[in-house]
């Protein structure tokens, strides 16, 4: 962004995109010819020789400055989305990852994170995993599949029922403890895929959930990066 003395916008590059902005400035005429600023009349001696070559004694003719491009400003919500995409892309690349993996529940948060990941590093590098339990509705499972089809990400289904049952056969858990066990089975699954294939696990929680602790430690809170960690649910 380049702003003039009168606060007018002289040039603005596209936001959150690689590019180069060049601005020609219509500057006032230079001062009368004289010694460079800071130069004195003292004579200096040194063990080197300076040769000056004059290519032309004619002054360069002035030219009309070319107007710089002023890219339109992204609306607030679009700006937040672009910032989140850029942040995820930079984090993945600068930490040496080639791909990401996340759980797809059929809900809005995981759908948004999956879309952000596809825009950031390409759908071919995004792995979405549906991990249904005996309590999962057909609607949530079909929504996860449809999201994968629409975005083009790599999709797999890993039922967690047998994992949960193995725990419950050995530990008596009910109510909230059993519900959290399902979330933790999903977390273990994602971390296992990460260790096996080198994916970065993305957590899908948003700022509102993290602020009030609405998540399961070692469960849906698992992950190396949470794209929505600074995005409130209300946005």
Predicted regions and their residues:
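C-terminal beta-strand edge segments of enzyme domains
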Residues: 1-76
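Active-site adenylate/phosphate-handling loop in enzymes that bind or generate adenylated species
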Residues: 151, 172-235
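Conserved helix-loop functional segments at active or binding sites
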Residues: 89-98, 119, 123-126, 166-169, ...
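Residue-level signal for inorganic ion chemistry
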Residues: 107, 148, 202
């Amino acid at each position: 962004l380049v702003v003039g003395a009168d606060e007018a916008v002289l040039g603005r590059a596209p936001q959150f995109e690689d590019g180069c902005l060049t601005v020609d400035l219509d500057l006032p005429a230079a001062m009368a010819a004289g010694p460079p600023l800071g130069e004195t009349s003292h004579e200096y001696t040194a063990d080197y020789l300076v040769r000056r070559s004059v290519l032309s004694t004619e002054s360069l003719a002035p030219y009309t400055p070319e107007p710089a491009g002023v890219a339109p400003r992204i609306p607030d919500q679009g700006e937040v989305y672009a910032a989140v995409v850029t942040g995820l892309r930079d984090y993945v690349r600068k930490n040496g990852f080639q791909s990401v993996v996340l759980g797809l529940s059929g809900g809005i948060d995981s759908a948004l994170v999956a879309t952000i990941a596809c825009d950031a590093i390409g759908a071919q590098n995004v792995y979405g995993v549906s991990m249904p339990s005996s309590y999962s509705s057909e609607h949530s499972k079909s929504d996860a599949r449809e999201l994968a089809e629409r975005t083009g990400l790599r999709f797999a289904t890993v039922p967690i029922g047998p994992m949960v049952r193995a725990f419950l056969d050995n530990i008596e858990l009910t109510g909230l403890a059993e519900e959290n066990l399902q979330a933790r089975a999903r977390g273990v699954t994602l971390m296992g895929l990460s260790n096996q294939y080198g994916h970065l696990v993305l957590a899908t929680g948003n700022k509102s959930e993290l602020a009030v602790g609405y998540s399961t430690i070692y469960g849906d809170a698992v992950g190396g990066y949470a794209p929505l960690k600074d995005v409130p649910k209300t946005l």
